[in-house]
Amino acid sequence: MAKRDYYEVLGVAKDAADDELKKAYRKLAMKYHPDRNPGNKEAEEKFKEAKEAYEVLGDEQKRAAYDRYGHAGVDPNSAGGAGMGGGFADAFGDIFGEIFGAGRRGGGGGPQVYRGADLKYALEITLEQAANGFETEIRVPSWENCDTCHGSGAKPGTTPKTCRTCGGSGAVRMQQGFFSVQQTCPTCHGSGKEITDPCTSCDGVGRTRRNKTLQVKIPAGIDDGMRIRSAGNGEPGVNGGPPGDLYVEIHIKQHRIFQRDGDDLHCELTIPFTTAALGGELQVPTLGGKAEISIPEGTQSGKTFRLRGKGIRGVRAGYPGDLYCHIVVETPVRLSDEQKNILRQFEASLNDGGDRHSPQSKSWTDRVKEFFS
C-alpha cells in the first residue's frame, strides 16, 4: 500500500511553519496514542503514521529532501520509483551478471528519476453550479522549479559536482548476504549531484513555493466528493521525471431549499391549513425555474409529490432525476379574536361528523385507547 503524503497525514499545508507541524502532531499523538486506545490496531497504525510524518517534516534537512523528492528522498530503501520489481531484478541481475558477464539491468547508469507529487485542491461550489456545469479559474499552491537556478539548486554561474558517494548514478549498492541491492544514494538523494554553492533564491532546493493559476472545467451533474483529474498539473518531476497530476475535489454548499440525493432533489413545501383542507394550485421552485402542482382536498403533512425530470442530470446519467416535494401543513399563529371565534364555530360544526372529517385522528385515538386498555 502506498504511503500517504506526510503533509496530508498531519493535516497541514505544505508551507506550514514548525509550530504548526508540532501542534498538529501533538493533537494526533494524543488522539491515537496506544495507551488511550488499548487493542485498537487502527489507532496504533495512525499513531505510527503521524510519528513517521513528524520525524521527517520536523527535521529541516529531511523536510527539504522530502519536498524535493517525495518519499524516495527520505527512504533509504527506495529504488528510485522502480518499486519492488526493480529492486528484485537488480539483486538477481548482479548475481547472474557476475557469473555470465551480462550487463546490469535497470537505471543504475544515471541519476534517479522521480515522478512529481500529485496535488489536491478543494473547490466549493453551489448546487446550481453543480447541476449546470461551469468553467472557473483556481490558484493552486505548488512547488515549482526555481526561476533563478532553473531547478538545479546551484547558484547561477556554478555547476553542481558529481556526487562522491554514488559517482553520479544517484544510487548505491549494498551487499545483503548473497544479494547486491540498489538503494537511493543517501548523500544526493538520487540526483547524482552535490551542490557546493547553493542558489540563494531557493537555498539549494531547486524549487520555490508559489501559486499557479489554472482553468478547470466542472462538468454538469457533478456530485459532492467527486474528483476531477488534471493530468500533468501536479508538481514537476525530478531529474527529468514526469510531473504529477492535480486532483480537484468538489464540495457542494448546503442549499437553502433543496437537498440532493444522487440525481434526485428533495424540498419541504409549506402550505396553509386552508389549502391543505380545500386544495388548490401552488407554484414550487425548481433548479430550472418554477413548476405548478395541484394540491388535492384533505392533503396531510408528510404527503409527497413527485415532479419527474425536475432533479439533476448526473454526470453518467442519460436522463435527469426527480424532485420530491414533502408537504408541511402550517398551523396559523397570532390569530385575532374574530378569527378564533370563526375557528371555534368551525370546530363545533365538526362534532357531529368528526370521524368522517378527521379519519387519521380517529384512528390514532382508537390506537391510544387500545394501548391503555
From Swiss-Prot:
Cofactor(s) listed: Zn(2+)
Biological process per Gene Ontology, one example term: protein refolding
Gene Ontology CC: cytoplasm
ZnF bounds (CR-type): 133-211
InterPro entries: DnaJ, DnaJ_C, DnaJ_domain, DnaJ_domain_CS, HSP40/DnaJ_pept-bd, HSP_DnaJ_Cys-rich_dom, HSP_DnaJ_Cys-rich_dom_sf, J_dom_sf
Chief location: cytoplasm
A molecular-function term among this protein's GO annotations: zinc ion binding
Binding site for Zn(2+) 2: C163, C166, C185, C188
Superkingdom of origin: Bacteria
Alphabetic keyword roster: Chaperone, Cytoplasm, DNA replication, Metal-binding, Repeat, Stress response, Zinc, Zinc-finger
Coiled coil regions in record: none
Domain spans labelled J: 5-70
Domain notes for this protein: The J domain is necessary and sufficient to stimulate DnaK ATPase activity. Zinc center 1 plays an important role in the autonomous, DnaK-independent chaperone activity of DnaJ. Zinc center 2 is essential for interaction with DnaK and for DnaJ activity.
Entry-linked PANTHER family: CHAPERONE PROTEIN DNAJ, DNAJ HOMOLOG 1, MITOCHONDRIAL-RELATED
Function, as annotated: Participates actively in the response to hyperosmotic and heat shock by preventing the aggregation of stress-denatured proteins and by disaggregating proteins, also in an autonomous, DnaK-independent fashion. Unfolded proteins bind initially to DnaJ; upon interaction with the DnaJ-bound protein, DnaK hydrolyzes its bound ATP, resulting in the formation of a stable complex. GrpE releases ADP from DnaK; ATP binding to DnaK triggers the release of the substrate protein, thus completing the reaction cycle.
Name listed for the protein in its UniProt record: Chaperone protein DnaJ
